[in-house]
Every structure is written in C-alpha cells, then in structure tokens.
Regions:
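N-terminal cofactor/phosphate-binding cores enriched in small/glycine residues
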Residues: 44-47, 51-132, 143, 149-154, ...
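Bacterial N-terminal signal peptides that target proteins for export
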Residues: 2-12
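Conserved small/polar residues in nucleotide/adenosyl-binding loops
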Residues: 251-257
Length: 261
C-alpha cells in the first residue's frame, strides 16, 4: 500500500483502503517510507487493473476538525499499528487492520499557538512522526506541536518524561537569540540517525523572525548535541563570504527556513 495524505481544512476522517488479499505486510517506518526517504513502496498488489474495485476497509474520525484546521499527516505503519496526528495535533495509534483506536496523546494545548499572542495556529500543521526503536522495550515517537518537540512511548501513548522537560523540548530555546515570542515550529518530521533526532525549523517569513537553524537532539535525554547555523557564525565555514559581518547579530533577521532534513 502506498502512502496517503489528506489536504482538507475540514477533514475529520482518515480512510484506509486495502486489497482483499494481501501478501506479507510491508511497513511504512519513516515519513519518506524507509531510511532512504524515497517515498516509494515496493507493493504491487494494487495497479491500474484492480484499483477501481477497491473498497473501504474502515474509517476513523479524529473528532477535532473545524473550519480553521487541516490535516497533512503521512502516517507510519509499524508492527500492525498506524501512527498519525489529528487536525488539532493529537497523536494517535490505531490497529492498522481494524481501525480500532489504541491510544490518543493530547499535548494539552487547545487552540495552541506557537508564538504567544499571535494567531499562528492555522500554520501549525504536523506532517508526520518519527519512530525510534532500541530493543523491544524502548520504542519512541517524536512529533512537533505548537513549537514543542514531544517524545511519546509508542506502546502506551504516554510522554517519556526523561526526555527534555516532562517529555518535550521547547523549540524556541537554543537558537542563540530570544525567540520566546516569535513563531517557531517544526512541521515536517525529524530524521532519526543513530541516537539523534535531527529537526528543521519553520519560522515566520517577515522581519520579526527567529533563526531557521537545524538542530540535533539526543533521543533519550532531549539534550541538544549540535546545531547548524543557516547563516554561518564567526569561525564557521562560509562566514568569510558574508560582506556584512554584523548580519549574524541581527535579532530579527529572517533566516532561511528549513522545513525538513
């Protein structure tokens, strides 16, 4: 089965369609399908000869859509479980075969805005989640909602409190400037590499904007391990190419936005 996406401001359902007879299951473990991130499925059961005969297997309603929300998520399917995010950024797990709800994680930020006092909720979509596994007993999901990166137990749906502060990281922090009142998000899932989750940064495209740096966090502790500055800092490669050396110190310089890595 190939990936699917729903692009509707008022979508309240996710619909999965299966062929009646499928062979051995093929998982969709990354936002891009696999570690190569090539958005490709090797499944061949569905083609132009039988696509017209497909029937809906089940339907799931998230129950939280309104005229201001949208859903752009590309779900993961791992070990028979589907993981996705609702219009109001609730993370949920379903039995991929039946559509039965297993658990729902609510980040507890109703009508959340990434920048305090600014109506950016309409921009706060979440396009998917990242999955990390270290043995049978350590399975983690990472996803962003309202300017925070959350770490959730993939089996129980509970936040892993040893990660960051009570299971989340404030993405407004560790940018080198005070971005507490600026729009900061990470709408595309981070990339898992060994014990790191590497996330891009989405910022406002206006004068008052936070830096759009790329950051890597320890998947266990939430500690930032490194940062790539989209405008080179003194001593970094490429800094010498900037004619205006004071550019890096501008508080509200609109830096490149990195949606994904």
């Amino acid at each position: 089965m190939r990936k699917f996406q729903i692009f509707s401001k008022s979508s309240i359902a996710i619909i999965i369609v299966f062929l009646a007879a499928c062979h051995a299951p093929v998982e969709w473990t990354n936002y891009g399908g696999n570690k190569a991130n090539n958005h490709y499925s090797s499944l061949v059961q569905i083609d132009t000869n039988n696509v017209a005969s497909l029937k809906k297997a089940w339907e799931y309603h998230t129950g939280d859509a309104d005229e201001k929300t949208q859903i752009q998520v590309n779900p993961l399917i791992i070990d028979g479980v589907l993981y996705a995010v609702s219009p109001k950024l609730k993370l949920f797990a379903l039995d991929a075969g039946s559509g039965k709800e297993i658990w729902v994680f609510n980040p507890a930020e109703p009508n959340s805005v990434s920048a305090k006092g600014n109506g950016y909720f309409s921009m706060n979509v979440c396009r998917g989640v990242s999955f990390y596994k270290n043995g049978k007993n350590d399975q983690r999901l990472f996803y962003s909602a309202s300017g925070s990166l959350y770490c959730v137990n993939a089996v129980t749906g509970k936040p892993i409190t040893s990660f960051g502060t009570d299971g989340k990281i404030d993405l407004h922090q560790d940018l080198g400037v005070d971005a507490s009142n600026l729009y900061v998000a990470s709408t595309t899932p981070g990339m898992i590499y060994k014990d790191l989750i590497i996330v891009g940064t989405r910022v406002a495209e206006e004068a008052a904007a936070a830096p759009g740096h790329i950051r890597a966090y320890d998947v266990h502790t939430g500690k930032m391990r490194w940062i790539f500055h989209t405008i080179p800092q003194p001593g970094e490669a490429g800094y010498e190419s900037w004619d205006n050396k004071e550019a890096v110190s501008y508080t509200h310089l609109t830096l490149p936005t990195i949606y994904s890595v």
